[in-house]
UniProtKB/Swiss-Prot annotation:
Its EC number is 1.1.1.37. Signal peptide: none annotated. Substrate binds at R83, R89, N121, R152. NAD(+) binds at G10, A11, G12, N13, I14, G15, D34, N96, I119, T120, N121. This is Malate dehydrogenase. Keywords: NAD, Oxidoreductase, Tricarboxylic acid cycle. Transmembrane segments: none annotated. It comes from the Bacteria. HAMAP family: Malate_dehydrog_3.
């Protein structure tokens, strides 16, 4: 059986971490693409030299040529300008649209059948732009957002309750920004809902509210601490989990920015936004789950925020 090919467009902190995780998990051969001369090649050589130590036997190479995307099974896109202190995801819009155009055309001409995962921010708009320029069908392109946001939610809950994070199931829907919706109703600890934990006095409502707020600003918290960049370990781990579900046909249900059809969650148009999504060898399939009236209202606010940014993106493209 031929080995799978995973191409990482953008060889920065997230791209390099993605490559390392892909090797450790033995997902396939790795190509690191970046426009910076020498940098992807240097990282690829460094990563290749970890293979004897890790006990894996895969190829890793760096490139500046979009032709090397040819026959990729998975393409994970992190290219773009990263967030800086005081910069919102939305500030990145104009710059990164141009990046998505270049990357999208590279995918279109070299690997139109690849499964594409977008990580570039502002996420919900960038995955929309990437599809526009690449022509990849709805079921073969998705944005990495909810897996990361949910991981942050789970981490904060586990820390607050002093339990194993593996016992915490928590989900976040909506746009990958300040309007995201951590689902307190369907989230649980070892099967016990957060609402029940609050009723039993094991979790104070004000602490839960603080955790929800911290989850929404989780990315910004890390940006403020790092001062010179943004998160990359957890975003890379999230992207690899999604890629692995596709490559191994795991059919995992993960919160992702998938193309949600009009009619689902009250949408009046097709829209990339974070919802529970099955990822299999056939690609992505958004799933509608029951949420509370309050969460539905919050989700609508988030949907409107994504739609507003899409309008701004359309105006930028029209100039």
């Amino acid at each position: 059986m031929a080995r799978k090919k995973i191409t990482l467009v953008g060889a920065g902190n997230i791209g390099g971490t993605l490559a390392h995780l892909a090797l450790i998990k033995q997902l396939g051969d790795v190509v690191l693409f970046d426009i910076a001369q020498g940098m992807p090649n240097g990282k690829a050589l460094d990563l290749l030299q970890t293979c004897p130590i890790e006990g894996v036997d895969f190829k890793v190479r760096g490139t500046n040529d979009y032709k090397d995307l040819e026959n990729s099974d998975v393409v994970i896109v992190t290219a773009g300008v990263p967030r800086k202190p005081g910069m919102s995801r939305d500030d990145l819009l104009g710059i990164n649209i141009k990046v998505m155009q270049t990357v999208g055309e590279g995918i279109k001409h070299n690997c139109p059948n690849a499964f594409v995962i977008c990580i570039t921010n502002p996420l919900d708009i960038m995955v929309n732009m990437l599809q526009k320029f690449s022509g990849v069908p709805d079921n073969k392109i998705v944005g990495m957002a909810g897996v990361l946001d949910s991981a942050r939610f789970r981490t904060f809950l586990a820390d607050e309750l002093n339990v194993s994070v593996q016992q915490v199931q928590a989900y976040v829907m909506g746009g990958h920004g300040d309007t995201m919706v951590p689902l307190t109703k369907m989230s649980n600890v070892a099967g016990v809902s957060l609402e029940q934990l609050v009723k039993e006095g094991k979790l104070k409502q004000e602490r839960l509210d603080a955790i929800v707020s911290r989850t929404r600003s989780g990315g910004g918290e890390i940006v403020a601490l790092l001062k010179t960049g943004s998160a990359y370990y957890a975003p890379a781990a999230a992207g690899i989990q999604m890629a692995e579900s596709f490559l191994k046909d795991k059919k995992m249900i993960l919160p992702c920015a998938a193309k949600v059809k009009a009619g689902m969650y009250g949408l009046d148009e097709d829209l990339f936004v974070g919802v529970p999504t099955e990822i299999s060898a056939n690609g992505v399939r958004p799933i509608e789950v029951e949420i509370s009236d309050k969460e539905r209202e919050q989700l609508q606010v988030s949907i409107n925020a994504v739609k507003d940014l899409n309008k701004v993106a359309a105006e930028i493209l029209a100039k």
